[in-house]
């Protein structure tokens, strides 16, 4: 019954001191209110209250040793009460005689239940205070060191913060988008002009053709030219079967590889056709020169026409009409592409 009442009071009020004074009232009722016998005095004097101020390990070992001794004395008539007294020895300071060996100068400790109740809060307060002081001290030291170390700049508050990576993006992105749109519009406006201006000037297109055909050796081009002129001089190629490509720009931009040129020349030989005003002019000129019925005179006339007559006629045409220069070059390019 007593234990249940103590438990209930302890649960209802954890700071209640009646639980600690239950043993004291039992001892007072058993031993009497005023006189103590020698046995109780000797037992109370044998308790070493000085060991309570030592470390936790020594205090724990002394408590276990005392618990073992109390178990051995359990058969005595007052051993039960002595074991109960041991749970709260700080309330028995009035029973200790004046001639006892307890000469400690330490103050009387509060009740153990109150210590158990306040220990967590005390430790929490101490830990918070220590951490707060340490954090403040570290912050003060770090601020002092930071002031000494940081560079002298106008934006010292933003030192070490990468705001230029994230914070400024929303301000810069709109301007970048507007610039990109402006660039796209300018490109769209300039591209039709260039596309219109390219077919208008035949000289520019011929320059592009010359730049594309510059990769081939001049000897190969001269051989092709000589072969075509020989065919024209013999009259094996007529200019009436194949239409010209003077207006088709895609025809000039076709890839001109040696294999393609060889294939095209073979097709021309098989079809017996050519397409160029200059070739027709050269054909008529060579026919006018070739009048001899002998093969030797034909060969000599072809050689002379290949080596001397064509450059001479082109020079004469360029000297008479400079505007015909681009047309002649364009016709030569079309003949080579075929």
Swiss-Prot record:
Protein name: Increasing suppression factor 1
Keyword Phosphoprotein found: yes
Function: Could influence the NAM7/UPF1 function, possibly at the level of mRNA turnover. Participates in mitochondrial biogenesis.
Family membership noted in the UniProt record: Belongs to the ISF1/MBR1 family.
Record's compositionally biased regions (Low complexity): 50-70, 267-306
Compositional bias segments (type: Polar residues): 307-316
Positions of region (Disordered): 50-75, 267-318
Phosphoserine, modified sites: 119
This protein's encoding gene: ISF1
Classification lineage: Eukaryota, Fungi, Dikarya, Ascomycota, Saccharomycotina
Keyword GTP-binding belongs to the record: no
Organism: Saccharomyces cerevisiae (strain RM11-1a) (Baker's yeast)
InterPro entries in alphabetical order: Mbr1
Keywords per UniProt: Phosphoprotein
